[in-house]
């Protein structure tokens, strides 16, 4: 029997799910145990294709046995597993359709299963139990222990809120993680296989303020509105459909665009869409293109922030896509022609935030480049500052703030040869976090930024600058402080 398309039992008794949770807890089947076994620092460093060929030794604890089955994806001898995990473990896992008899001497897992923060998640396997070549399939439920999913999990907002929609939910991991701080969560995906896995994960974790729905994007939640919508859509540009979890059409935007276009109708006032995706920059940058997507659908009532983590040049992407699909030079050239026809200049990967206004005001766009190891808190702070600096009374509040220059800021002074020797050419201020920014600066701006050490108020800095004879006006000074804060040079 082919177990590659097995689905865990999502209609088992609550007693069985509770017993499974107890097994994991008593076995210390935790992130720390996985990291110790693989000698890694985080789950996203697991490389299953390599690890299943490695020998991590005979399991000596129940946690090791569970890790071998569900994370390494290797078979284990039933007697050994029973001695580690207890007499009832095998029958429990069989009832839940999580294991099967591979042969007379070993059992194997039907799924991958692992801890993600405070929940356990089951997904489709990513390797074959018998060591044969692993073949994926169209509606495979993508594992969420790889780096791409880890990035999405990091950006999930955790503040208390009303209902949440996890769109393109796959395993339903976002809905389960956010259920702890949300009134209710909904996991929505288009495939029956994802629905079944999400239902199992919900029951396995004993989380009941969450619902699983099936349909095309927002269709199964028609008429509902949310405080938060989170989505990690299929965004891979493809010539032809590959797998549902990654195929985003020729430009990679077909699903992402619809997620954004239809979001306004499902966001409550003050609600936000968080979308981790790859969007193409064309004649207009990504943030302006996103506003065009919302034209006639709430564009004037939304703020847009796009924080770019990676920028892929089209030639490099075309080469990688050709190699990945085992194509040839003709495929490479066809990719370049396709991007040229669409006017694509680069493929920008990052976090898109769209907020529906809670009250009427002017909308804004912000687009910044972040380091690869970005902190979601910096992105949230950036977006919050853009909102605050457009609020009533902001300028009076600004004068009492004590900004501090970001520790990553550097001042470069360039000289050029001229009459009489070296002459000052210009100043350049650069930073590598929280955003990658480089600006030309005057001596006055360099002097101003040096005043922001976290001990002086903005008002005091203005006074000192005025006393130094800089001759800067109040309005230009405020505008400069706001601009430097927007670029991430200042922290409060």
Label every PLM stretch briefly.
Residues 2-65, 104, 129-131, 359-450, ...:
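Acidic, low-complexity/disordered tracts enriched in E/D and polar residues
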């Amino acid at each position: 029997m082919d177990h590659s398309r097995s689905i865990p039992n999502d209609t088992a008794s609550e007693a069985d799910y509770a017993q499974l949770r107890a097994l994991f807890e008593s076995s210390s089947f935790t992130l720390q145990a996985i990291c110790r076994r693989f000698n890694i620092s985080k789950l996203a460093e697991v490389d299953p294709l390599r690890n299943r060929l490695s020998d991590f030794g005979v399991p000596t604890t129940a946690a090791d046995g569970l890790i071998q089955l569900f994370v390494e994806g290797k078979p284990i001898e039933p007697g050994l597993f029973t001695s580690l995990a207890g007499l009832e473990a095998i029958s429990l896992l069989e009832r839940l359709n999580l294991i099967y008899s591979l042969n007379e001497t070993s059992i194997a897992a039907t799924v991958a299963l692992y801890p993600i923060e405070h929940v356990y998640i089951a997904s489709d396997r990513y390797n074959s139990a018998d060591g044969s070549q692993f073949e994926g399939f169209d509606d495979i439920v993508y594992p969420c222990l790889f780096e791409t999913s880890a990035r999405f999990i990091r950006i999930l907002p955790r503040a208390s809120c009303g209902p949440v929609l996890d769109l393109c939910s796959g395993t339903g991991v976002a809905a389960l993680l956010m259920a702890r701080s949300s009134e209710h969560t909904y996991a929505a995906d288009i495939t029956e296989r994802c629905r079944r896995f999400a239902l199992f994960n919900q029951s396995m974790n004993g989380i009941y303020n969450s619902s699983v729905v099936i349909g095309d994007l927002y269709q199964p939640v028609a008429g509902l509105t949310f405080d938060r919508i989170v989505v990690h859509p299929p965004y891979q540009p493809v010539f032809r459909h590959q797998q549902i979890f990654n195929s985003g059409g020729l430009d990679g935007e077909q699903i992402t665009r619809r997620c954004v276009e239809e979001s306004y109708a499902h966001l409550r006032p003050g609600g936000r869409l968080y979308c981790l995706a790859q969007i193409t920059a064309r004649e207009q940058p990504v943030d302006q293109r996103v506003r065009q997507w919302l034209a006639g659908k709430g564009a004037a009532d939304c703020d847009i922030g796009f924080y770019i983590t990676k920028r892929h040049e089209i030639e490099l992407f075309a080469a990688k896509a050709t190699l990945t699909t085992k194509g040839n030079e003709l495929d490479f050239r066809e990719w370049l022609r396709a991007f040229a026809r669409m006017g694509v200049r680069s493929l920008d990967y990052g976090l898109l935030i769209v907020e529906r206004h809670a009250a009427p005001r002017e909308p804004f766009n912000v687009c910044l480049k972040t380091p690869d190891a970005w902190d979601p808190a910096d992105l949230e702070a950036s977006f919050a500052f853009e909102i605050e600096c457009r609020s009533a009374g902001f300028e009076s509040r600004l004068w009492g703030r004590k900004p501090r220059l970001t520790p990553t800021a550097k001042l470069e002074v360039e000289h050029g040869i001229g009459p009489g020797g070296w002459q000052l050419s210009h100043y350049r201020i650069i930073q590598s976090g929280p955003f990658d920014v480089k600006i030309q600066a005057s001596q006055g701006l360099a002097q101003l930024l040096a005043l922001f050490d976290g001990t002086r108020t903005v008002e005091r800095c203005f006074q000192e600058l005025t006393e130094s004879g800089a001759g800067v006006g109040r309005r230009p000074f405020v505008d400069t402080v706001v601009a430097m804060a927007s670029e991430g040079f200042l922290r409060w």
